[in-house]
Structures are given as structure tokens and as C-alpha cells.
């Protein structure tokens, strides 16, 4: 069974309620139809039912009738959700009038469904920007306890089974926080290890905090940040297996790890890689993807109290379908 097959199987085993607020986007609706047909999640669509069914008929989709469809313009819960939004944001300048307007936005409405306990996760981005996806999530659902920054992990399925977990690595941050400080980097480490467990199914995440230095081989303030982040990550999660700073070869190659970091439990055996900044992470995963012919699944947003994931506006139907399964796995772990 491949990694994505195992993710889908886990999603099927305990179906979660996943909101797809961009319901009139053709790829999204097609992916919803596939997810409903395969029973990987209970899908909630936001929008006018007549318009959604008309698009489904045009696309030849047969399973949309199995979805829960909620129209913010007519839902009996809209007023209560508007009140909830006002209460959550009144100290930030929210007014009842503004809340009544925002609740009609499908992305806000979906996050309010989750906050109210009526759904488990949300996926958008086929039409919306990352900012439009994250803003309601952070305002309504907020970050996980002990976490103050959102980050993005990527599942890297490589052609080299001797690395990571049979060739699978979970890496972060590749998507959100450009220049994390030591505290944020520690949070990214903890969250990426959790993603490795909940989504990739790693029983034993081994986290390497990457740098251009291994265990003091170089001196620089950016190395100091990684060392401090490693210490803080251990404080955040005393059970986390994490070491740093490590160079990439020392983290992945057993013979190199033994030479550069003798006695290390992680060196040469890492399956979770944490990059010192977004610039490095984004470049590194794309190089591995293109030059190493690796499959990259994600980014998977992490650090939010309930899963909210962001798609590329160039995403495929298959990308959205996979993200439904991934979000479902995250939702199980978040409960």
C-alpha cells in the first residue's frame, strides 16, 4: 500500500466532516463527488443548492446529493454564527453589522461551522489566496494550544528507500513563516512531527533541525538560532525525538551521521526535516521534487486548532481529493 493509499484508508475508517466552501469551482465540486463516491469524508458544501446541483449536472457528477449543502443566505444558523463571530472579534473592532456581512463569505461561514463543532476541517484555495484562506481560520479557529505560528509541511515521497521512512520524509516549513525566530522554529518542529504521525503515519518521528553546521562545526548567529530552537522544541514536547543542529547529509546518511555526530540517535536516521527558514525549505523541497523525481504532497497547514488547508490555485482535481483525505486524518488527531 502506498502512502496516499494508507492516508485514504485511514480517512475511510473514521469519516470526518470536511467543508469545501468553494463549491461552484469545477475542480472542487468534482473532487467532492469523488470523495463522496469513495466515502473518504462527509462533505459539506457552502452555497446555493440550485446552483451547485446545476453545475453538478453540467459536469456529469452523480454523488453530490450525498453532500450536506448549506446556503449562508438562507440557513437558520447564519444569525447564530454571526453572533459568534462578533463575540470572538469584538475586542478587535468587529461590529454586529460587519459580522453579519462576513458570515455570508463561504470561507468565514465554513470556519464558523468548525468553531461551533458542526464540522471537522476545511479546504479552500482553488479560487482564494492563501491570505483569504488563513484569515478566517486564525480569527475564528485560532492556533493550537502552545502554538503561535502557522507553518506548512510537505510529504516527500522519494526514490531512495534508505532515507527517512522507506523513502518518505516530512519536511517543514515550506509555505508560511518566512524568517522564524527560535521559538517559532521550535513550534514548527513540534507541529511537523505531529503531521508526520497523524498524516504520514510515522510511529516514531525523528526530527533533524537542519543547518549548515553539525554540532558546533561552524559558528554563526543563524546556527545559534537552530540550537536554541532545538532546546525549546524539547521543552514544548519532552517526548519529541529531536536533535540539532545537523547538516542534511548528517541527518540522512547513517555513515555521515556517525562521523559528524557520533552517539546521536537522530543523525543518519531522521525522517522529519525542519528547515531554518522558509526560503531554504521552499527551495529544497522543489529541488528534491524536480531533480530527484520525488512526489511532493502538500503543503499541509499545521498549527491551527482544527485543520484548515490551502490549495494552489493551479491545483488538480486529484490534489483536492488527496487533501480531503489528509485533512480528515488531521481532524481525527485534533479531537
Question: Language-model segments: which ranges?
Answer:
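Anion-binding alpha/beta catalytic cores of soluble intermediary-metabolism enzymes, centered on
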Residues: 1-267, 272-335
Amino acid at each position: 500500500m502506498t502512502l496516499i493509499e494508507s492516508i485514504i484508508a485511514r480517512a475511510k475508517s473514521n469519516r470526518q466532516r470536511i467543508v469545501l466552501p468553494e463549491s461552484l469551482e469545477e475542480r472542487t465540486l468534482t473532487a467532492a463527488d469523488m470523495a463522496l463516491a469513495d466515502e473518504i469524508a462527509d462533505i459539506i458544501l457552502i452555497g446555493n443548492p440550485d446552483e451547485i446541483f446545476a453545475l453538478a449536472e453540467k459536469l456529469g457528477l452523480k454523488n453530490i446529493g450525498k453532500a450536506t449543502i448549506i446556503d449562508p443566505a438562507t440557513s437558520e444558523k447564519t444569525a447564530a454564527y454571526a453572533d459568534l463571530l462578533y463575540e470572538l472579534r469584538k475586542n478587535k473592532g468587529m461590529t454586529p453589522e460587519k459580522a453579519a456581512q462576513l458570515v455570508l463569505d463561504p470561507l468565514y461561514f465554513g470556519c464558523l461551522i468548525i468553531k461551533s463543532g458542526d464540522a471537522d476541517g476545511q479546504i479552500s484555495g482553488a479560487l482564494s489566496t492563501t491570505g483569504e484562506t488563513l484569515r478566517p481560520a486564525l480569527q475564528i479557529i485560532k492556533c493550537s494550544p502552545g502554538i503561535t505560528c502557522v507553518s506548512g509541511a510537505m510529504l516527500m515521497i522519494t526514490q531512495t528507500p534508505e532515507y527517512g521512512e522507506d523513502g518518505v520524509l516530512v519536511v517543514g516549513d515550506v509555505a508560511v513563516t518566512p524568517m522564524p525566530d527560535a521559538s517559532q522554529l521550535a513550534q514548527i518542529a513540534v507541529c511537523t512531527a505531529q503531521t508526520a504521525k497523524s498524516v504520514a503515519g510515522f510511529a516514531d518521528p525523528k526530527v533533524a533541525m537542519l543547518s549548515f553546521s553539525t554540532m558546533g562545526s561552524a559558528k554563526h548567529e543563524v546556527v545559534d538560532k537552530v540550537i536554541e530552537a532545538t532546546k525549546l522544541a524539547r521543552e514544548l514536547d519532552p517526548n519529541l525525538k529531536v536533535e540539532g543542529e545537523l547538516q542534511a547529509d548528517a541527518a540522512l546518511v547513517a555513515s555521515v551521521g556517525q562521523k559528524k555526530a557520533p552517539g546521536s540517535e537522530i543523525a543518519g536516521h531522521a525522517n522529519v526535516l525542519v528547515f531554518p527558514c522558509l526560503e531554504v525549505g521552499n527551495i529544497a523541497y522543489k529541488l528534491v521534487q524536480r531533480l530527484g523525481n520525488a512526489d511532493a504532497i502538500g503543503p499541509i497547514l499545521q498549527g491551527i486548532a482544527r485543520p484548515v488547508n490551502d490549495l494552489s490555485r493551479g491545483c488538480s482535481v486529484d490534489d483536492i481529493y488527496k487533501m480531503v483525505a489528509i485533512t480528515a486524518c488531521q481532524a481525527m488527531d485534533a479531537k
